[in-house]
Amino acid sequence: MKPLHLKLNNFGPFLKEEIDFSKIDNNELFLISGKTGSGKTMIFDAMTYALFGKASTEQREENDLRSHFADGKQPMSVTFEFQLNNRIYKVHRQGPYIKEGNTTKTNAKFDVFEMVDGKYEIRESKVISGTQFIIELLGVNADQFRQLFILPQGEFKRFLISNSREKQGILRTLFDSEKFEAIREILKEEVKKENAQIENRYQQIDLLWQEIESFDDDKIKGLLEVATQQIDKVIENIPLLQARSKEILAFVNESKETAIKDYEIIEKKTLENNILKDNINQLNKNKIDFVQLKEQQPEIEEIEAKLKLLQDITNLLNYIENREKIETKIANSKKDISETNNKILNLECDKRNIDKEKRMLEENGDLIESKISFIDKTRVLFNDINKYQQSYLNIERLRTEGEQLADELNNLIEGLEKVEDSIGNNESDYEKIIELNNAITNINNEINVIKENEKAKAELDKLLGSKQELENQINEETSTLKNLEIKLDRYDKSKLDLNDKESFISEIKSAVKIGDQCPICGNEIQDLGHHIDFDSIAKRQNEIKEIEANIHTMKSNIAVHNSEIKFVNEKISNINIKTQSDFSLEVLNKRLLENENALNNQRELNKFIEQMKEEKDNLTLQIHNKQLRLNKNESELKLCRNLITEFETLSKYNNITNFEVDYKKYVQDVNQHQEHSNQIEDKLIQLSQRKLIEQNNLNHYEKQLETYNNDLELNEQSIEMEMSRLNLTDNNDINEIIAWRGEQEELEQKRDTYKKRYHEFEMEIARLESLTKDKELLDSDKLKDEYELKKGKMNTLIDEYSAVHYQCQNNINKTQSIVSHINYLNQELKDQQEIFQLAEIVSGKNNKNLTLENFVLIYYLDQIIAQANLRLATMSDNRYQLIRREAVSHGLSGLEIDVFDLHSNKSRHISSLSGGETFQSSLALALGLSEIVQQQSGGISLESIFIDEGFGTLDQETLETALDTLLNLKSTGRMVGIISHVSELKNRIPLVLEVKSDQYQSSTRFKRN
């Protein structure tokens, strides 16, 4: 990501400000300079806020970014343009604020644009989705951006001095290692779940084992005393338990079967005695009831006499009823004959009227026949009347169109002949164009090589001059440095170290007196006077310091010039002078012009020929289409003429409308005549059928009357014969007998009931006498007592057997469940062993006491430290190297950083470094971190870095080394910007972004020193 343009409105001290980063040439190192509080860091805040909606430091909130001097009606906004992977983007973020006069907050806005074909096209227009788009585009979030692109105050050395837990948070964010922690948690939960399942299965086994019935049997109790944790012993005891349970069940079953047999014997004996007792009682009762039934015998005999008489008179009564029915039928037949004769007379009258109507209709038959003939002949015309009518309408139009098409066809043919004459024998020559293009390309390449070589030679001469000038300066500075070192060597430094010696000597003098033994040398003190000229020594010390400062300045200048020579040498090595043509630029340009003219002429000729061919093809196509249209016109015109001729010949009409009206009228007349004729025929047929039906009915009624008269005569004869047989003289005798018929059913039922009961008593008494014959009745009370005793014993043993059988089966089921649980538990422990081991390893229970996440983070930290040491070795003159502290505890250590001092060959805590050494280490570590993150992430493009930290803690030599490091970053294609108050940087860095403040707002400008 490389900044291009930054626009700030009401942001911090900037009310309306624009910064054009495109003024920075070739990723030049530049300094951001200004007074304290002028808003230098706010530039970093603006870029971070534009991208992520956050400041460059976590401590600064969004509300702190709005200018206190902003117009209450204007929003705070930042517009940031940047380049990423050769594509240009623009983001515009407006912060939320309460507009002056309002009580509700105006919402934030965020738009993301991408430049396409020189214009910006919007990609996102919502705050949340837009910010997510930027995170995915850059490949980093706000925290990662602070670590990789912008190193703000307070953040620069945080990674270096942080403890393991703090580094874990930073590295977790940068390398997205939370997924490894998630794996650990998943495995932890999986193990926890598996352990719970295993424990639950142990509990189920123990519960089942405790529930096994012992039957109060000592052997079973002994087997059940085994603890369920002894799984193998439990498996061994289960068959023994089952065998002993079967033995107990068999013993109880044998007792039960004996009791059942005893019960069945007494039950049978009791049942037989009860049956005998019931049979004797029933026999006595039936005999008494039978005697009472026989007393009804006289009444039954009287009933049978009445029923016999009723049976004998039945035929006579039937004949009397039949006579009444026959007389009714005769009367009905006479009535039907009279009504049928009247219907026949009415039908004959209706037929005469319809015959008259038919004769009137037949008088118009000839006229209707002529109309039917016309309809049959012209029906085909009427069915397609639209076709013929359209022919009358189209014939004139088709004549006109045909003449017009013929004229247009002749014109097109003439045009085609002219185009063919223009083309002649000419053909397009594209091979010649290819040859000319190749020749032009080759000439342009030769011209470009000559121009590039001239430019490269000029650049080489300039660089060689700069190099020579730098070498001369280095020679002069080296000579001056040698003179200063010679001058410095002339001083005896061993006698000039006066740090605290003067006060130390004064303290010794105050503690001793003349004659005492010296605590330093052990000799007797002879004199306490002054023997050292401290003023002279101090003067020489100042001279030495001045020389050492000059030496340091010379070394710094030499280092800077050596770095510049190195940079110039790199540029010289990158200059490539290619082999060029023997021809001069003038000759090549002349040949280029000739080929370009020939190319243009050939292109014009090809273009003209192609246009003529295209016009020829177009005319040919038009002629073909016109000919098709003309042929179609002639065909349609011929068809219209044939249809009109056909219509007029068949119909004898020359007007479609008149024909259509007459045809419809004829059809209507014919249909009406036909319909009327059909109606008359239908009526005649119906009348004939109805008359025939009535005639048949009349014959039927007459025959029926004759039959009824004969039946009546025969029935009278039968009545006379029956009365004679029954000795009945008149109807009174008959009526008396008829009165008994109402009681006949009751009398028959009474008789039948008597006979049925009489027979049943005979049968039942005979049966009971056979059952009780030769049998003795026993004492019922004694039998009952014995029965109850045997039954109680049997039920008790059955219940006991059922309980024992159920408990045995239950024991079998439980032991089977126990075996199943144990088998599943063993398999589960075997299957999950690898998961348990893996969970322990990733949780830190391993030989390194590291969690999986910390193991990964240590791997990345080792890579970062290795990359950082490449630069730290240069900056510290091969004295310091960063090392990772190897001592670890359970999962949370191993990320601390110590420094290894190659001078003392020992490692020490990072806090023992001086301010300048800490800055060097922090810078090297930050650059190493950014490079490793870029290597791992792939999609992150680190084209710029901004630093706001610590240059004031560096001495001159260290400052020069740090600048060399940053210059090397620039040579890798990265824009480097730094914030500092160090005056030497203003002299060393030619490009400065100056931030000025006038108390209430700030402004910026680029300037060169």
Swiss-Prot record:
Q: How does it assemble?
A: Heterodimer of SbcC and SbcD.
> Which branch of life, at top level?
Bacteria
Q: Matching NCBIfam families, A to Z?
A: sbcc_Staph
Residues the record lists as binding ATP? G34, K35, T36, G37, S38, G39, K40, T41
Q: Which organism is it from?
A: Staphylococcus aureus (strain MRSA252)
Q: What does this protein do?
A: SbcCD cleaves DNA hairpin structures. These structures can inhibit DNA replication and are intermediates in certain DNA recombination reactions. The complex acts as a 3'->5' double strand exonuclease that can open hairpins. It also has a 5' single-strand endonuclease activity.
Which molecular function term from Gene Ontology is one that the record holds?
A: endonuclease activity
Q: Which Gene3D superfamilies match?
A: P-loop containing nucleotide triphosphate hydrolases (3.40.50.300)
Q: Family membership, please give it.
A: Belongs to the SMC family. SbcC subfamily.
GO terms for biological process? Answer: DNA recombination; DNA replication; double-strand break repair
PANTHER family referenced in this protein's UniProt entry, alphabetically: ABC TRANSPORTER ABCH.3
SUPFAM superfamilies in UniProt: P-loop containing nucleoside triphosphate hydrolases, Rad50 coiled-coil Zn hook
Q: Cite the entry's keywords alphabetically.
A: ATP-binding, Coiled coil, DNA recombination, DNA replication, Endonuclease, Exonuclease, Hydrolase, Nuclease, Nucleotide-binding
Question: Which chain positions lie within coiled-coil regions?
Answer: 176-208, 264-366, 392-501, 535-638, 664-802
What is the official name of this protein in its record? Nuclease SbcCD subunit C
